[in-house]
Amino acid sequence: MQDLRIVLVIVGALAIAALVLHGLWTNQRNKRAQQKNTAPKAVAAKRSSESRDVDGFDADGIGKVRVVPRNGSPVRDNDPVISSVPQFSAGDEDDVLPGQDAISAESQQEPFEEAQQESFRGDWKDVYVINISAREGSYIYGRDLKHALRILGFRFGEMDIYHRHLEMDGQGEVLFSLINMVKPGTFEPSQMDRMMTPGVSLFMQLPGIGRGLAHFDLMLKAADKLASEVDGILLDTSHQPLSEYYLTQCRDELKAYDHQ
């Protein structure tokens, strides 16, 4: 009797193992059949996708964020908070589609002055930035920064950053602002004496038309004075030494903005 039970147990185990093996074999066979059916479709889809990429139909045109303002590497504590703002030209036109050549010649003609204005639109950025970096191996110390900001008329305010208003007493519109290069970019006035940072960034959002260039020149003067007070170095948005080429480019863009 005992021997029979042992035999039944062995047979049962073998039966279960056979069922499991059969199920696995069936499953693998179905997967291979499915892969054979879907492989041609996948290849065709891939070729179609590659064709679209070559023709440019899938391009979304979105560039890097620059604050807005041109800066995908891993986030570090000293990564700049302000990046770059992509430039978009309102004069850009979509590709001509079939059938659009039927538009009348009259509707395609524009006065020369209007076309000339169109060429200037969108050639400026939404935000202009001047970085002030500590010298290599050093930091900008909060106590020096606080002293310089007081001299230059900056006031701590919205978004927990410093702002330079039209009036030295903090009245009027904001001309430009200052943030910490260390994320999240804010300051704590009560901790300024113990703070140190690799750098700060001055940024100016576009003001009303006609005031862009004037505000930028004021920001440049403030940046130069601030760098002198904290023994810093002026850098552009690419974190290269501030050059006449960069300043000329900014001024030309703002002139176009002011005269649109």
Swiss-Prot record:
Region (Disordered): 31-98
GO cellular component: cell division site; plasma membrane
Periplasmic side: 1-5
Record-annotated membrane-spanning stretches: 6-26
Keywords, comma-separated and alphabetical: Cell cycle, Cell division, Cell inner membrane, Cell membrane, Membrane, Transmembrane, Transmembrane helix
Cytoplasmic side: 27-260
Membrane topology value: Single-pass type I membrane protein
Localization per record: Cell inner membrane
Record-level GO BP terms: division septum assembly; FtsZ-dependent cytokinesis
Main location: membrane
A Pfam cross-reference name: ZipA_C
InterPro entries with a match to the protein in the record: Cell_div_ZipA, ZipA_FtsZ-bd_C, ZipA_FtsZ-bd_C_sf
Keyword Ion transport: no
The keyword Cell division appears for this protein: yes
Family, per entry: Belongs to the ZipA family.
Subunit note: Interacts with FtsZ via their C-terminal domains.
Function comment: Essential cell division protein that stabilizes the FtsZ protofilaments by cross-linking them and that serves as a cytoplasmic membrane anchor for the Z ring. Also required for the recruitment to the septal ring of downstream cell division proteins.
HAMAP family: ZipA
Protein name stated in the entry: Cell division protein ZipA
Organism: Tolumonas auensis (strain DSM 9187 / NBRC 110442 / TA 4)
Name of the gene encoding the protein in the UniProt record: zipA
